[in-house]
C-alpha cells in the first residue's frame, strides 16, 4: 500500500524540531514576565501640558492625577505584582473606573468651572450668567485608558524577557529561521518543481471540506462584525450598513444567481480536514487579533525586539529613543524574516523557472527596503511628532491608494505639506501620480502582476509563507460570484471613505479647490466612468450581467445626486455620517479584520490569496484596467494540453485554468495576478505569460484566426 507521507532527511527533521521549539518558546514568553505598576508612569499622561494654559484645564489635570492616585491606592494597583497581562489590565480598568466616578462626582458636587475665550476672559451667556464648560471637557476620558494601557503594562513588566531580550530573540527568531533553513536547504538537492506529493493528504496542507470551511468562515466573519459593534462604541451606523450589505450579497449569490443547493468544490477530498492546518490557521488568527486589537497582551514580544528597534533609531537619528510602545516594529521584523526564509523555499521549489526566481527576489527586496528599512530610517530622522517641529513622512513608499487607505487623511496630508523641505510634497505628488498615471500605465503594459506579484508586501507574504496552501483556493462558480461582489464592494467603500475624508479636509470658501469644486470633479469622474462602461457594454467589450450594469449605474446616479445635494446645502458630514467614524470603521473592518485576521489567518483554510482575491481594493482597481485595457494575457496551446489539472490546482486566485487551456482560449481575468505558477507547473508548456497590443479587445475570444494580406499584414480576426 503506498504511503501518504514524503521522506525527509535527518537534517529536515532537525529543522522541524528547532522550529517547533522556537514556536513553543515564542508562545510561552507571553506568560514569563510579572507586572508591577509605578505611580509615576500611571500619572504622567495626565500632567498638564504646554497647551493646557487655561486655569480649569490645569485644575482638571490636577484632579485627574489626584483621584487616579487615590483610586490606585484603594485597589492596590501600586503595591501588587501581577503575573499576567490580563490581571494587569483588569486592575487598570477597575482603578480607572473608580477614578472616573470620583472625578465626575467632584464636578457634580462642586460645579463645573467657568468657560473662558481665547484671550482668557470669562464667557457669559446672553442672559448675563456665567457660561460653564461641559462635563466631557473635564472628566476622565475613556480614550486615555485605551491609548495608554499597553504602554503602562509595558513599563510595568519585570522578568526574564524584559531583562534578557537578546536571549529570547535568538531562541525564537533565531531558532525559527535556522530550523526553517535546515528544512528548506536540502530541497536544493532534490528535483525542482512540484511533485504532487500528497498535498491533499498532508494534515497541514490538505485543507477543509466545504462544511468545515463554511463553519470557520462564518464564525470568523460574524465574530468580527459583533466585535465591530463594540469597537465603534455608540456609532453603529456603519456596522449596521455593513451587516445589511453582507446579507444582500449572500442573497444575490445564493438566490438571484441560483447558487443555493448547487455543489461547490471542496478545498480537499471529501470528509478530509487538515488538523494541522486548522491549528496553524487558528494560531494566525489569534496572533492578528492580539496584534490589532489587544496589543497590551503581547508586550513580551515587543520587549524582545526593542534593542533592535532602538539600535536602528539611535544609529540614524544620533539621539536616544523616547519611551513609548508600538507593536508595529515587531510585526515588520516578523514579516521580513518570514518572507526571507520562505522566499528561499520558493526559490528552491521553482528554481527551474527564472521568472519565479526573479519575482521572489523582487518582492523580498521591496519588502525589506521600501516597506521596512526606509520607513524606519525616516522615522528615526523625524524631528517632532505632531508638535511645533515638522515631521518627515515615513510611510511605505510603494503602497498605493486605495491599499494605503489613510493616504488622504488630514494628519497624513499635514505631514506631507508642513515639512520645510521638499520630501513631503514629493511623496504627496508621487502617491497621486501613482494612482492616476502609474497604475493604469503599468497595468496596460504588463498587467497587474507588476504590483501584485513583484512589489506588494501582501502578495509577497502570500507567495512565500502562503505557497504551501495555494492549492486550497476555491475554483467554484459560487466563489467567483462572491469574489466579484465583495472585492468591488470594498473598492466602492474605499472610494466613498476617501471622498468623505477629502471633503471634510477641504475648505468651504473661495479657493479654487474647495468642497464644491471637489464634488463637481467627483461627479464628472463618475459620469465619465458610467459613459465609458455603457459604450463598452453596447460594443460587447464589457462582459457584465445586466444586473451588474444596473447596480453600477444606480450607484453612479445616486452618488451624483448626493453630490448635488451637498453642493446646494453645504453640509459638513459627507454621506450623512461623521468622517472620523467612517475612517475608524474602514480601518477596523478592512485594514485589520479583512486584510489581517481573515486575509492571513485563512491561509491554511482557504488558500494564500484570500485578501488579494476577495478584499484588496487596489487589486480591484488594477483588475478593472487589466480586464479591459491591458496588453497582458496568458496564452494557451490547447493541442498540447493533457488535462492533468496542475494549472488549476495551483492557481492561488481560484481560476480554472485547465478549462481555458482545453479550449485553447487565452486567459484574461481581472483577478489574475500573473504569478506564473500555472505555467511553471505545466508539464507540456501549454501556458505562456505574454504581452501584446495587437488584440487588446479580443484577447478573451474563444475562436480567432490569423488573417494575412498584403494591405493589412498579419492580424487576428474573429
Positions of predicted regions on the chain:
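Non-ligating segments of multi-cofactor redox enzymes
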Residues: 1-665, 670, 677-680, 684-718
Amino acid at each position: 500500500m503506498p504511503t501518504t507521507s514524503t521522506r525527509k532527511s535527518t537534517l529536515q527533521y532537525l529543522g522541524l524540531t528547532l522550529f517547533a521549539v522556537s514556536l513553543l518558546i515564542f508562545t510561552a514568553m507571553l506568560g514569563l514576565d510579572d507586572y508591577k505598576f509605578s505611580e509615576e508612569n500611571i500619572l504622567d499622561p495626565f500632567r498638564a501640558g504646554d497647551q493646557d494654559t487655561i486655569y480649569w484645564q490645569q485644575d482638571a489635570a490636577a484632579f485627574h492625577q489626584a483621584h487616579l492616585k487615590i483610586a490606585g491606592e484603594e485597589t492596590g494597583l501600586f503595591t501588587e505584582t501581577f503575573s499576567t497581562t490580563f490581571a494587569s489590565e483588569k486592575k487598570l480598568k477597575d482603578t480607572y473606573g473608580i477614578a472616573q466616578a470620583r472625578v465626575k462626582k467632584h464636578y457634580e458636587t462642586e460645579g463645573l468651572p467657568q468657560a473662558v475665550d481665547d484671550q482668557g476672559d470669562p464667557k457669559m451667556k446672553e442672559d448675563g450668567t456665567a457660561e460653564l464648560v461641559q462635563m466631557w471637557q473635564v472628566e476622565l476620558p475613556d480614550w486615555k485608558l485605551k491609548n495608554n494601557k499597553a504602554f503602562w503594562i509595558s513599563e510595568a513588566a519585570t522578568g526574564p524577557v524584559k531583562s534578557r531580550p537578546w536571549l529570547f530573540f535568538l531562541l525564537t527568531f533565531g531558532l525559527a529561521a535556522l530550523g526553517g533553513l535546515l528544512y528548506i536547504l536540502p530541497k536544493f538537492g532534490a528535483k525542482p518543481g512540484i511533485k504532487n506529493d500528497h498535498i491533499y493528504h498532508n494534515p497541514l496542507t490538505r485543507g477543509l471540506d466545504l462544511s468545515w470551511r463554511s463553519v470557520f468562515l462564518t464564525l470568523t466573519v460574524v465574530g468580527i462584525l459583533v466585535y465591530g459593534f463594540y469597537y465603534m462604541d455608540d456609532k453603529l451606523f456603519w456596522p449596521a450598513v455593513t451587516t445589511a450589505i453582507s446579507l444582500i450579497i449572500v442573497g444575490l449569490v445564493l438566490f438571484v444567481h441560483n447558487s443555493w443547493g448547487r455543489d461547490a468544490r471542496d478545498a480537499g477530498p471529501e470528509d478530509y480536514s487538515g488538523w494541522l492546518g486548522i491549528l496553524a490557521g487558528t494560531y494566525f488568527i489569534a496572533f492578528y487579533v492580539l496584534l490589532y486589537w489587544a496589543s497590551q497582551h503581547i508586550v513580551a514580544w515587543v520587549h524582545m525586539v526593542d534593542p533592535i528597534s532602538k539600535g536602528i533609531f539611535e544609529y540614524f537619528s544620533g539621539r536616544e529613543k523616547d519611551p513609548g510602545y508600538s507593536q508595529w516594529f515587531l510585526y515588520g521584523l516578523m514579516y521580513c524574516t518570514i518572507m526571507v526564509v520562505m522566499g528561499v523555499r520558493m526559490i528552491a521549489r521553482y528554481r527551474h523557472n527564472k521568472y519565479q526566481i526573479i519575482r521572489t527576489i523582487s518582492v523580498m527586496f521591496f519588502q525589506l527596503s521600501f516597506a521596512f528599512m526606509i520607513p524606519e530610517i525616516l522615522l528615526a530622522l523625524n524631528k517632532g511628532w505632531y508638535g511645533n517641529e515638522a515631521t518627515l513622512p515615513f510611510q511605505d513608499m510603494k503602497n498605493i491608494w486605495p491599499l494605503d487607505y489613510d493616504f488622504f487623511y488630514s494628519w497624513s496630508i499635514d505631514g506631507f505639506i508642513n515639512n520645510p523641505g521638499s520630501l513631503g510634497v514629493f511623496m504627496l505628488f508621487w502617491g497621486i501620480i501613482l494612482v492616476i498615471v502609474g497604475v493604469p500605465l503599468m497595468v496596460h503594459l504588463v498587467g497587474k502582476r507588476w504590483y501584485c506579484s513583484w512589489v506588494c508586501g501582501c502578495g509577497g507574504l502570500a507567495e512565500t509563507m502562503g505557497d504551501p496552501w495555494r492549492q486550497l483556493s476555491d475554483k467554484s462558480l459560487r466563489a467567483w460570484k462572491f469574489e466579484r461582489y465583495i472585492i468591488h464592494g470594498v473598492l466602492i467603500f474605499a472610494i466613498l471613505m476617501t471622498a468623505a475624508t477629502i471633503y471634510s479636509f477641504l475648505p468651504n470658501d473661495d479657493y479654487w479647490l474647495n468642497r464644491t469644486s471637489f464634488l463637481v470633479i467627483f461627479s464628472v469622474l463618475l459620469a465619465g466612468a458610467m459613459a465609458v462602461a455603457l459604450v463598452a457594454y453596447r460594443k460587447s467589450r464589457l462582459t457584465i450581467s445586466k444586473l451588474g450594469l444596473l447596480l453600477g449605474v444606480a450607484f453612479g446616479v445616486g452618488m451624483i445626486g448626493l453630490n448635488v445635494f451637498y453642493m446646494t446645502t453645504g453640509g459638513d458630514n459627507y454621506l450623512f455620517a461623521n468622517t472620523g467614524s467612517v475612517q475608524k470603521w474602514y480601518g477596523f473592518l478592512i485594514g485589520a479584520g479583512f486584510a489581517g485576521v481573515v486575509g492571513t489567518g485563512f491561509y491554511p483554510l482557504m488558500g494564500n490569496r484570500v485578501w488579494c482575491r476577495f478584499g484588496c481594493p487596489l487589486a480591484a482597481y488594477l483588475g478593472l484596467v487589466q480586464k479591459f485595457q491591458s496588453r497582458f494575457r496568458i496564452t494557451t496551446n490547447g493541442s498540447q494540453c493533457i488535462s492533468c489539472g496542475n494549472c488549476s490546482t495551483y492557481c492561488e486566485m481560484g481560476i480554472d485554468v485547465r478549462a481555458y487551456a482545453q479550449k485553447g482560449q487565452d486567459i484574461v481575468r481581472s483577478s489574475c495576478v500573473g504569478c506564473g505558477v500555472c505555467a511553471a507547473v505545466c508539464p507540456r508548456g501549454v501556458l505562456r505569460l505574454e504581452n501584446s497590443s495587437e488584440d487588446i479587445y479580443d484577447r478573451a475570444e474563444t475562436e480567432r484566426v490569423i488573417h494575412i494580406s498584403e494591405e493589412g499584414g498579419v492580424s487576428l480576426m474573429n
